[in-house]
């Protein structure tokens, strides 16, 4: 055993050992030493995109998973911790454009490097189950299930709106549109309607909403999904009109439909707004160039809901009017840039008195504001919006004719009934959730397995011809999808008639790849999409990932699972029983700003920080030139702010165990973690102390095998077993920061117990090593072997978890505070089971009392059991 802790040597030796014994290959239905089948536990981190290098967020995520897996394995579980790569997507195409390499080559190189980094972290990953979503063996099942959905009507084709770059001749993602222009060409982006494929996720909306209740997920994630699914109970009704189209027929049968959850405010409607693509807008713009220009502007805007919520609300009158169904009044129709044709009927009613958005819109364009809801004692003013204007809990109808005095529920019921009797409306449930458009006009993704034939139309690729393999040698040049220009891929024969035909060149949304990879981990070599091994492991017991995936990935994975269930492929309703969303890793930011307002960000490693007496930063200078930089505050580590820490550099300098220990100790897993260089140094010092204790006490620890502890060891054993009890609790509730704190207390106790017997040192240090092992497996493995524990208990991987000795926690004596005339003067030691009389006797006989009593007998002795004794003289 080396006297000095050398992380690189210790970690290399441990990793070579684990590799030699294939330590992390996990079978199904494993049995324990007693011959009984172990309970399974499937713990999985969200698979990474192979961007090139791990970042500290990866390190934290995977270490949380690894700690959990190792702890559960030592406690008798059959634990699966797999890993794979979310390998399709736009970043690979962008890298290809920048570097002139095929996305496939870039992706596979990155996978190889990142896998090597993960292995250097000592993660307990079963690499025999590795999956890359860009592998034809994987994405063939994306294609297969898509065809099954097509057969069942779950997948269908319709036109959808996309961002079109007319210069690069390509479709852009929303994030590639910057101020209305293409990110690469700078061309003004157009909105185009093109045929796309959709999945009917809305058919599962009710189940997706209801099943959230049974999941062990953070409440805020459930709420985010609930809001995204967006169940609304309201009334859909029509404003009638007599507006005719060019064909002489009434547009939309003379009805403008809207949906509202606030039917009680219907008498306050002063305008209606329609989407730019609405037939009434198109009709009105035919002879109105100004309106046509505004509609064109709307069509060039974003269709993302997040953007719609924050952008300036604009509108223009159409000159058209519709008839209010209950009052008969004429209501002006406007085109609004905030109304989407893809949502509901592409039209909304405007009630500015009781809707904040409508209130702002009406004030901007000087539209009437009519109050029809009153909350007692609240004066109404059109000058500024007040929260009570939209209050449906306490408001009652006013200025609403027969509905006056009705509260929200009663008014909605009465108005819905009247509209229904007129044949103009009905109560209805609507959903914010929309069907999932999966077509992407991009190259690096799963090919959609369809063929276009001039004679037969759209024809599915026969199952025996799957997978439709994506050519991996294409290099995008930014001018459209390269699949459209590759005859090897494009040209084929129609499976139905045999005539020349063309393959579909759209690829699938990459969220499809991440919908079910965790199932393929369970059976990566299966000849079918999944097999019986998936039934054994799924549903997953613990999923770990960032809060940024709370909606789309998790929602799509839940939907995909339910489709697989309905197709008879799986036997469960939900894929992830429990979810942990780890907090972000933060770091300081520093920058300089030029005259034009452009900021240049500097990495914290390149900056010297000046602090005050309390350690608070008061200034900073760049090391390169000594000139000041601005302290930008603490933010999430990111490339854009240049405040990341390279995990590989950290591992090279301090070792993987130090990196693991710091990210586990610095904060609870679900909370944000603020980077601290001094914290890393502290973690490194602690590990050196652990090693030094093992080296200094090696002979005693080895000699302590087989003997029994002595009475003199009681204090040490009581401390260690008490801390062990708390550590067990903290492991179970995934509070790994306090687990690390527990091991620090254990080490302090061991170092302080100078006279402990060899047997106590062996027992207590062995407990420390096992409790610490899931967090820092390399150093603990090295000490475990060097000190002879492996001979007694076997490999630390599967060593039995230490059991709390309840007997060791029992105190034979307790120390009570001693007061004299109400003032603390010392303490008195009494047997733990001493009664009141015995405590009084011990206190009266103490030297401290004798000193203050000066021969006088106590007047009274007050005992607070277990805490203090007060002697009144």
Swiss-Prot record:
Alphabetical keyword list: Aminoacyl-tRNA synthetase, ATP-binding, Cytoplasm, Ligase, Nucleotide-binding, Protein biosynthesis
Residue window of motif 'KMSKS' region: 636-640
Gene Ontology MF terms in the entry: aminoacyl-tRNA deacylase activity; ATP binding; leucine-tRNA ligase activity
Highest taxon above the source species: Bacteria
Keyword Lipid metabolism among record annotations: no
Catalytic activity of the protein: tRNA(Leu) + L-leucine + ATP = L-leucyl-tRNA(Leu) + AMP + diphosphate
GO CC terms, sorted: cytosol
InterPro entries on file: aa-tRNA-synth_I_CS, aa-tRNA-synth_Ia, Leu-tRNA-ligase, Leu_tRNA-synth_edit, M/V/L/I-tRNA-synth_anticd-bd, Rossmann-like_a/b/a_fold, tRNAsynth_Ia_anticodon-bd, Val/Leu/Ile-tRNA-synth_edit
GO biological process entries: leucyl-tRNA aminoacylation
EC class (word): ligase
Residues that, per the record, bind ATP: 639
Family membership noted in the UniProt record: Belongs to the class-I aminoacyl-tRNA synthetase family.
Identification of the protein by name: Leucine--tRNA ligase
Originating species: Cupriavidus pinatubonensis (strain JMP 134 / LMG 1197)
Gene designation per UniProt: leuS
């Amino acid at each position: 055993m080396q006297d000095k802790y050398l992380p690189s040597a210790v970690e290399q030796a441990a990793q070579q050992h684990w590799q030699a014994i294939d330590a992390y290959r996990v079978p199904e239905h494993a049995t324990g030493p007693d011959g009984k089948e172990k309970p399974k536990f499937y713990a999985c981190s969200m698979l990474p995109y192979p961007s090139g290098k791990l970042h500290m967020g990866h390190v934290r995520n995977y270490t949380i998973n690894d700690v959990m897996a190792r702890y559960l394995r030592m406690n008798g579980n059959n634990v699966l911790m797999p890993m794979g790569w979310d390998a399709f997507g736009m970043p690979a195409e962008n890298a290809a454009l920048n570097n002139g390499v095929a996305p496939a080559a870039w992706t596979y190189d990155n996978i190889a490097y990142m896998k090597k980094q993960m292995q250097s972290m000592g993660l307990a990953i079963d690499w025999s189950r590795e999956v890359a979503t860009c592998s034809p063996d994987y994405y063939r099942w994306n294609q297969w299930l898509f065809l099954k959905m097509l057969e069942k009507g779950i997948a269908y084709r319709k036109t959808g709106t996309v961002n079109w770059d007319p210069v690069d001749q390509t479709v852009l993602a929303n994030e590639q549109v910057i101020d209305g222009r293409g990110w690469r060409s700078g061309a003004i982006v157009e909105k185009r309607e093109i045929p796309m494929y959709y999945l009917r996720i809305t058919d599962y909306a009710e189940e997706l909403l209801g099943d959230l209740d049974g999941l062990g997920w953070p409440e805020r994630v459930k709420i985010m999904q609930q809001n995204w699914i967006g169940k609304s109970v309201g009334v859909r009704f029509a404003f009638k009109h007599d507006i005719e189209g060019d064909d002489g027929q009434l547009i939309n049968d003379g009805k403008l439909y809207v949906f509202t959850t606030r039917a009680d405010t219907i008498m306050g409607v002063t305008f209606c707004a329609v989407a730019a693509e609405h037939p009434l807008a198109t009709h009105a713009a035919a002879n109105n160039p100004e309106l046509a220009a505004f509609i064109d502007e709307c069509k060039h805007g974003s269709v993302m809901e997040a953007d719609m919520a924050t952008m300036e609300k604009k509108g223009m009158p159409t000159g058209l009017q519709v008839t209010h169904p209950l009052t008969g009044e004429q209501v002006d129709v406007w085109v609004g840039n905030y109304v989407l044709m893809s949502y509901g009927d592409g039209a909304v009613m405007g009630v500015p008195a009781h809707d904040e958005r409508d209130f702002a819109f009406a004030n901007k364009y000087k539209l009437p504001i009519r109050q029809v809801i009153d909350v007692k004692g609240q004066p109404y003013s059109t000058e500024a919006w007040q929260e009570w204007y939209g209050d449906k809990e306490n408001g009652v109808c006013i200025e609403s004719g027969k509905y006056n005095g009705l509260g929200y529920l009663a008014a909605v019921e009465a108005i819905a009934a009247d509209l229904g009797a007129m044949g103009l409306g009905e109560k209805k449930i609507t959903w914010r959730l929309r069907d999932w458009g999966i077509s992407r006009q991009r190259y690096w993704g799963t090919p959609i397995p369809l063929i276009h034939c001039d004679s037969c139309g759209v024809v599915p690729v026969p199952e025996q011809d799957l997978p439709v393999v994506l050519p991996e040698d294409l290099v995008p040049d930014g001018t459209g999808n390269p699949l459209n220009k590759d005859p090897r891929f494009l040209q084929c024969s129609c499976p139905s008639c045999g005539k020349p035909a063309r393959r579909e060149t759209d690829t699938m949304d990459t969220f499809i790849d991440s919908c079910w990879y965790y199932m393929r981990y369970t059976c990566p070599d299966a000849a079918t999409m999944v097999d019986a091994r998936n039934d054994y492991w799924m549903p997953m017991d613990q999923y770990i990932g960032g809060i940024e995936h709370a909606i789309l990935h998790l929602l799509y994975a839940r939907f995909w699972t339910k489709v697989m269930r309905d197709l008879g492929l799986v036997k469960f309703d939900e894929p992830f029983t429990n979810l942990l969303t780890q907090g972000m890793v933060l770091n300081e930011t520093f920058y300089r700003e030029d005259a034009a307002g452009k900021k240049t960000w500097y990495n914290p490693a390149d900056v010297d920080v000046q602090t005050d007496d309390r350690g608070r930063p008061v200034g900073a200078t760049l090391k390169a030139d000594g000139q000041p930089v601005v302290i930008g505050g603490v933010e999430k580590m990111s490339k854009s702010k240049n405040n990341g820490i390279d995990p590989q550099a950290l591992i090279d300098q301090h070792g993987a165990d130090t990196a693991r220990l710091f990210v586990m100790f610095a904060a609870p897993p679900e909370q944000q973690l603020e980077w601290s260089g001094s914290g890393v140094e502290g973690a490194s010092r602690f590990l050196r102390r652990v090693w030094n204790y093992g080296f200094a006490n090696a002979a005693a620890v080895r000699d302590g095998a087989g003997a029994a502890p002595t009475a003199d060891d009681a204090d040490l054993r009581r401390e260690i077993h008490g801390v062990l009890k708390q550590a067990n609790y903290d492991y179970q509730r995934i509070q790994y920061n306090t687990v690390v704190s527990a091991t620090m207390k254990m080490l302090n106790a061991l170092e302080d117990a100078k006279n402990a017997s060899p047997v106590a040192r062996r027992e207590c240090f062995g407990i420390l090593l096992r409790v610490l092992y899931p967090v820092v497996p390399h150093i603990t493995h090295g000490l475990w072997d060097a000190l002879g524990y492996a001979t007694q208990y076997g490999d630390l991987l599967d060593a039995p978890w230490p059991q709390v000795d309840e007997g060791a926690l029992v105190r034979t004596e307790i120390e009570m505070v001693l007061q004299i005339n109400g003032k603390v003067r010392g303490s008195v030691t009494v047997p733990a089971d001493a009664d009141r009389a015995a405590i009084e006797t011990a206190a009266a006989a103490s030297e401290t009392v004798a000193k203050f009593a000066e021969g006088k007998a106590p007047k009274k002795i007050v005992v607070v059991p277990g805490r203090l004794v007060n002697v009144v003289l």
